[in-house]
């Protein structure tokens, strides 16, 4: 049990992020969660009551990330781990799209999938330095291979892989930095507004389970609860203390190619 450990999680209102809140809370962590809007805040409040801290706001806004950290420290006294998990998909957006659509989508995707992680880490860093804490970010099987999205999404997830390596080197020996790379996981992941996908949810795509199953050697599409275990390992001071600069794949073998 990690009763005294305090963790801040972005993208915590749905999908993998929501499952992370549940899993870390069950493991004894104190949790501060950043969600997108009041609807998600109400959902977490209904489930967790006052057991966790909740911030609703734009993950790309640095003041919002600072608020997430400050609320964690104000209530629980310190911060041990920051998890950057917010993200959007591009719904296979191609480079042959009109430039205005492509450029806007690129900016949205990189703002959320990459820049928001830097913002959250920057906000958390002063507190993590006090505790010799750690960072975990959500990468993807698309951090290693093509085919898991369009070029904007794949480029953003390759950037996350580079971020993990660079920051692990920069912040050692006092702060560990790692990532988790899920494969095909059915969630409510939305897309860029510039491409008209901001109201679209991956889980509602016709045939999404069969599509992921066909790409995954283990033969099934994951759900959020199937991919949270590596986050718990990497955040743990005891079990993860000798791990940094590592991205753990949990993709059903998708990175190996089709069977």
UniProtKB/Swiss-Prot annotation:
Keyword Oxidoreductase recorded: yes
Lineage: superkingdom: Bacteria
Alphabetical UniProt keywords: Aromatic hydrocarbons catabolism, NAD, Oxidoreductase, Plasmid
Pathway per the UniProt entry: Aromatic compound metabolism; naphthalene degradation
Ligand binding (substrate): 140
Stored InterPro entries: BphB-like_SDR, NAD(P)-bd_dom_sf, SDR_fam
Gene3D superfamilies (alphabetical): NAD(P)-binding Rossmann-like Domain
Catalytic residue list: 153
Annotated protein name in UniProt: 1,2-dihydroxy-1,2-dihydronaphthalene dehydrogenase
Native organism: Ralstonia sp
């Amino acid at each position: 049990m990690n009763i005294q450990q305090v963790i801040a999680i972005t993208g915590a209102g749905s999908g993998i992020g929501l499952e992370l809140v549940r899993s870390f809370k069950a493991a004894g962590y104190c949790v501060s969660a950043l969600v997108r809007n009041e609807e998600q805040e109400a959902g977490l409040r209904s489930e967790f009551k006052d057991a966790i801290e909740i911030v609703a706001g734009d993950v790309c806004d640095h003041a919002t990330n600072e608020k997430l950290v400050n609320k964690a420290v104000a209530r629980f006294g310190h911060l041990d781990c920051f998890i950057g998990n917010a993200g959007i998909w591009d719904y296979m957006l191609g480079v042959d799209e009109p430039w205005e659509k492509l450029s806007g989508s690129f900016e949205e995707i990189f703002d959320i999938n990459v820049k928001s992680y830097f913002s959250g880490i920057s906000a958390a860093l002063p507190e993590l330095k006090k505790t010799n804490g750690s960072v975990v970010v959500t990468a993807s099987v698309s951090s290693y291979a093509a085919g898991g999205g369009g070029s904007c999404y794949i480029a953003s997830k390759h950037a996350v892989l580079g971020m993990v390596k660079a920051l692990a080197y920069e912040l050692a020996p006092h702060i560990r930095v790692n990532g988790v790379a899920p494969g095909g996981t059915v969630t409510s992941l939305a897309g860029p507004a510039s491409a008209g996908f901001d109201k679209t949810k991956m889980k509602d795509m016709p045939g999404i389970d069969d599509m992921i199953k066909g790409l995954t050697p283990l033969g099934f599409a994951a759900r959020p609860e199937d991919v949270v275990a590596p986050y718990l390992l990497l955040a743990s001071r005891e079990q993860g203390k000798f791990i940094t600069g590592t991205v753990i794949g949990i993709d059903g073998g998708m990175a190996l190619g089709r069977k």
